[in-house]
């Protein structure tokens, strides 16, 4: 497949115009990736104009325990960030600014083991990623959204768009993306086969149902 084909699988989806209002979005799609080379072959996502909304078509919930690789493409103008699930053979392009911000917070978490080699490596990684993020300030928008607006996808225009599967927001329910028939982004994301891990919490209060069951197991005395 040529370079134009790869770009077509990842990048731009043009949405129809309703009611005279501009509704063009820059859709960044996930794709099939059976091996690392499938991700590295994909060209960088070019930065669109400032009047376009960015939307990352990722699953509504990602189980990070199933992620086999994280790619920060340093040479890309928008610091393309990709999560790879080798088992599902999927690569998800995610919001680099939100993901890297959380990643840097994890790297600076003080509760990590005070191992000298690990600490030096972690600090060096933090410095490199911090510099990569700071050098791309022109790609991010720092204009706050209006009160009561929650954007589920990154948008340089900071429009209150949200996800269509969570209900209409500001009249965007009529916008239908024009997707190629062979593009997997047009399909509904399948639920993960492995549920997310459940964190057990200690409960000092004894459970009444367990005590009731133990009492029921006691043998009853028979009267002669």
Swiss-Prot record:
<protein>
    <recommendedName>
        <fullName>Envelope glycoprotein L</fullName>
    </recommendedName>
</protein>
<comment type="similarity">
    <text>Belongs to the herpesviridae glycoprotein L (gL) family. Alphaherpesvirinae gL subfamily.</text>
</comment>
<keyword id="KW-0472">Membrane</keyword>
<dbReference type="GO" id="GO:0016020">
    <property type="term" value="C:membrane"/>
</dbReference>
<feature type="region of interest" description="Interaction with gH">
    <location>
        <begin position="20"/>
        <end position="161"/>
    </location>
</feature>
<dbReference type="GO" id="GO:0055036">
    <property type="term" value="C:virion membrane"/>
</dbReference>
<dbReference type="Pfam" id="PF12524">
    <property type="entry name" value="GlyL_C"/>
</dbReference>
<dbReference type="InterPro" id="IPR034708">
    <property type="entry name" value="HSV_GL_alphagamma"/>
</dbReference>
<feature type="domain" description="gL alphaherpesvirus-type">
    <location>
        <begin position="23"/>
        <end position="201"/>
    </location>
</feature>
<dbReference type="GO" id="GO:0046718">
    <property type="term" value="P:symbiont entry into host cell"/>
</dbReference>
<dbReference type="InterPro" id="IPR007923">
    <property type="entry name" value="Herpes_gL_N"/>
</dbReference>
<keyword id="KW-1168">Fusion of virus membrane with host membrane</keyword>
<keyword id="KW-1032">Host cell membrane</keyword>
<keyword id="KW-1169">Fusion of virus membrane with host cell membrane</keyword>
<keyword id="KW-1043">Host membrane</keyword>
<dbReference type="Pfam" id="PF05259">
    <property type="entry name" value="Herpes_UL1"/>
</dbReference>
<keyword id="KW-1040">Host Golgi apparatus</keyword>
<dbReference type="GO" id="GO:0019064">
    <property type="term" value="P:fusion of virus membrane with host plasma membrane"/>
</dbReference>
<keyword id="KW-1015">Disulfide bond</keyword>
<dbReference type="GO" id="GO:0020002">
    <property type="term" value="C:host cell plasma membrane"/>
</dbReference>
<feature type="compositionally biased region" description="Basic residues">
    <location>
        <begin position="213"/>
        <end position="224"/>
    </location>
</feature>
<keyword id="KW-0261">Viral envelope protein</keyword>
<feature type="region of interest" description="Disordered">
    <location>
        <begin position="161"/>
        <end position="224"/>
    </location>
</feature>
<keyword id="KW-0325">Glycoprotein</keyword>
<feature type="signal peptide">
    <location>
        <begin position="1"/>
        <end position="19"/>
    </location>
</feature>
<dbReference type="InterPro" id="IPR038311">
    <property type="entry name" value="Herpes_gL_N_sf"/>
</dbReference>
<keyword id="KW-1160">Virus entry into host cell</keyword>
<keyword id="KW-1162">Viral penetration into host cytoplasm</keyword>
<comment type="function">
    <text>The heterodimer glycoprotein H-glycoprotein L is required for the fusion of viral and plasma membranes leading to virus entry into the host cell. Acts as a functional inhibitor of gH and maintains gH in an inhibited form. Upon binding to host integrins, gL dissociates from gH leading to activation of the viral fusion glycoproteins gB and gH.</text>
</comment>
<keyword id="KW-0946">Virion</keyword>
<comment type="subunit">
    <text>Interacts with glycoprotein H (gH); this interaction is necessary for the correct processing and cell surface expression of gH. The heterodimer gH/gL seems to interact with gB trimers during fusion.</text>
</comment>
<dbReference type="GO" id="GO:0019031">
    <property type="term" value="C:viral envelope"/>
</dbReference>
<feature type="disulfide bond">
    <location>
        <begin position="44"/>
        <end position="76"/>
    </location>
</feature>
<dbReference type="InterPro" id="IPR022200">
    <property type="entry name" value="Herpes_gL_C"/>
</dbReference>
<feature type="disulfide bond">
    <location>
        <begin position="149"/>
        <end position="160"/>
    </location>
</feature>
<dbReference type="GO" id="GO:0044177">
    <property type="term" value="C:host cell Golgi apparatus"/>
</dbReference>
<keyword id="KW-0732">Signal</keyword>
């Amino acid at each position: 497949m040529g370079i134009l084909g790869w770009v077509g699988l990842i990048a731009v989806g043009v949405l129809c115009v309703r009611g005279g209002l501009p509704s063009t979005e820059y859709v960044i799609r996930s794709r099939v990736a059976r091996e690392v080379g499938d991700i590295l072959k994909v060209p960088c996502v070019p930065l669109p104009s400032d009047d376009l909304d960015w939307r990352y078509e990722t699953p509504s919930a990602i189980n990070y325990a199933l992620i086999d690789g994280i790619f920060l493409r340093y040479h890309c103008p928008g610091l393309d960030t990709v999560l790879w699930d080798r088992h599902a053979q999927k690569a998800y392009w995610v919001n680099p600014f939100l993901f890297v911000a959380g990643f840097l917070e994890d790297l600076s978490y003080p509760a990590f083991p005070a191992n000298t080699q690990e600490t030096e490596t972690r600090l060096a990684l933090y410095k490199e990623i911090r510099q990569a993020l700071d050098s791309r300030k022109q790609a991010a928008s720092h204009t706050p959204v209006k009160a009561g607006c929650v954007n589920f996808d990154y948008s340089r225009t900071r429009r209150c768009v949200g996800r269509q599967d969570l209900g209409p927001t500001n009249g965007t329910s009529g916008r239908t993306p024009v997707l190629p028939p062979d593009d997997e982004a047009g399909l509904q994301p399948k639920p993960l086969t492995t549920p997310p891990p459940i964190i057990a919490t200690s409960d000092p209060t004894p459970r009444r149902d367990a005590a009731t069951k133990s009492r029921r197991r006691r043998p009853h005395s028979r009267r002669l």
